[in-house]
Amino acid sequence: MTPNGKPAIRLSLRAGERIFINGAVLRADRKVSLELLNDATFLLENHVLQPEDTTTPLRQLYFAAQMMLIEPAMREQAHSTFAQMLKGMFSTFKDAEILNALKLVDELVHNGRIFEALKTIRAQYPREAELMGLESPVLPVAATRKSAEANP
């Protein structure tokens, strides 16, 4: 339990794996477990989307949101980009499931819960792929394992 009464977040990293915490990039030199005892903004390396992977509207939105987490110096610019993209998506997407998720994402980001917004966006990748006639993306096993460990 953390000092503020919330449960601690436990993370397990493999040797060489990186994690972004409050804008800092940390690399584990060996297998390690971390316990976050207070509110911290973090993103696991396998959830970091690279620019070349922003091939769909939701992935582009995810990238803008992730930049708010991992580049604090660019937070305002990333938020502005995110807001513009989100506004465009509300007029582009007609699918109720995605529109409801986008409304939730907007609310989460507005309340500073960017990590949860990222999870919500990722959860819509298969639906977006289906609507676009693309092969549904599969989350790597390692990412699934880490997500479960990070969110008991």
Curated annotation (Swiss-Prot):
Q: What terms describe the molecular function in GO for this protein? A: mRNA 5'-UTR binding
Q: Does the keyword NAD apply?
A: no
Range of residues in the leader sequence: none
A Pfam family annotated for this chain is: FlbT
Gene Ontology BP annotations: bacterial-type flagellum organization; mRNA catabolic process; negative regulation of bacterial-type flagellum assembly
Record keywords: Bacterial flagellum biogenesis, Repressor, RNA-binding
Cited InterPro entries = Flagellum_FlbT
Spell out the family assignment given in the record's similarity comment: Belongs to the FlbT family.
Q: What does this protein do?
A: Has a post-transcriptional repressor function in flagellum biogenesis. Associates with the 5'-UTR of fljK mRNA and promotes its degradation.
Q: Which HAMAP family match?
A: FlbT
Record's protein name: Probable flagellum biosynthesis repressor protein FlbT
- Source organism: Brucella anthropi (strain ATCC 49188 / DSM 6882 / CCUG 24695 / JCM 21032 / LMG 3331 / NBRC 15819 / NCTC 12168 / Alc 37)
- What does the record give as the organism's lineage? Bacteria, Pseudomonadati, Pseudomonadota, Alphaproteobacteria, Hyphomicrobiales
